[in-house]
């Protein structure tokens, strides 16, 4: 990823660092409009996810997470920006005339060939079942349910590792540090998701953040008591509690948010860090 640093001409561009290499030119038959409503509200209009709203209009790119074009080689034609995710996407032209978008694997360039199937080479961008991969393979876009499509390790720079295979299950180390079991028949894509340097980007100004649909974050200690448990007091005052809390009074730091007694608890060998 090519990082472009702005010249110091105005305060808004003084600290900006953006990607100037990849552009967006989507195909009409692979995009469709989507209606954003709610902006972090539930059905009653109450805020359940803060700091969301506004943002530029987006067209959704239909991504092929299933990779079900079996044993048909495809060629990478373009590498494009996708406003709906921080990873890039590739337009693939398959030998049978099919055209689809996939996540951009790290290191893939225009003109490379990829293929999905059961007996395909272990090379970057190829998709195949976990049972056909050697131990230690770096993978992304991993299925949890057979045939449903990849659901794990899809963000920019994400990569998981196949560390064991036993019986009907394979053991994976996920990007979060979690170690869990997945059926060996589920498929995944070899390699790491591209755009690894996404964390090096600096928007430089608040307006660029608003384009992404992210609104300002306000500290609870400067709110009124009716709005936040930390609010109230005269002037600059402490939160008045032993530990920080959420706006709804739950512990804010270190509290586990995973739902208890989920069906997949038995598949997780080590929880995430």
From Swiss-Prot:
Q: What is this protein called?
A: Large ribosomal subunit protein uL2cy
Q: What ranges does the record give for the region Disordered, renumbered to this chain?
A: 1-22, 224-273
Membrane spanning stretches = none
Compartments it resides in: Plastid, Chloroplast
Specify the superkingdom: Eukaryota
Note the subunit structure. Part of the 50S ribosomal subunit.
Question: Where is it mostly found?
Answer: plastid
UniProt-listed Pfam families = Ribosomal_L2, Ribosomal_L2_C
The family note in this entry says: Belongs to the universal ribosomal protein uL2 family.
An example Gene Ontology molecular-function term = transferase activity
Q: Which residues form a coiled coil?
A: none
GO biological process, alphabetically ordered: mitochondrial translation
Keyword entries, A-Z: Chloroplast, Plastid, Ribonucleoprotein, Ribosomal protein
Provide one Gene Ontology cellular component.
mitochondrial large ribosomal subunit
């Amino acid at each position: 990823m090519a990082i472009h640093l702005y010249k110091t001409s105005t305060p808004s561009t003084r600290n900006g660092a953006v990607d100037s290499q990849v552009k967006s030119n989507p195909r009409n038959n692979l995009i469709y409009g989507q209606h954003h409503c709610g902006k972090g509200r539930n059905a009653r209009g109450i805020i359940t996810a803060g700091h969301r709203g506004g943002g530029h209009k987006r067209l959704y790119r239909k991504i092929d997470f299933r990779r079900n074009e079996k044993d048909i080689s495809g060629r990478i034609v373009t590498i494009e920006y996708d406003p709906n995710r921080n990873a890039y996407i590739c337009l693939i032209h398959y030998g049978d005339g099919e055209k689809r978008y996939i996540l951009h694997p790290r290191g893939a360039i225009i003109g490379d060939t990829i293929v999905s199937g059961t007996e395909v080479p272990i090379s970057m961008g190829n998709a195949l079942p976990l049972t056909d991969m050697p131990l230690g393979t770096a993978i992304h876009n991993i299925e949890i349910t057979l045939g449903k499509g990849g659901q794990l390790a899809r963000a920019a720079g994400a990569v998981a590792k196949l560390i064991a295979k036993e019986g009907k299950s394979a053991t994976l180390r996920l990007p979060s540090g979690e170690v869990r079991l997945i059926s060996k028949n589920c498929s995944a894509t070899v390699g790491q998701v591209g755009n690894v340097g996404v964390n090096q980007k600096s928007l430089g100004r608040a307006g660029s953040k608003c384009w992404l649909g992210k609104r300002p974050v306000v500290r609870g200690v400067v709110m009124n008591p009716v709005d936040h448990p930390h609010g109230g007091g005269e002037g600059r005052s402490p939160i008045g509690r032993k530990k920080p809390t959420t706006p709804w009074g739950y512990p804010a730091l270190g509290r586990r948010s995973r739902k208890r007694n989920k069906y997949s608890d038995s598949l997780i060998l080590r929880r995430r860090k």
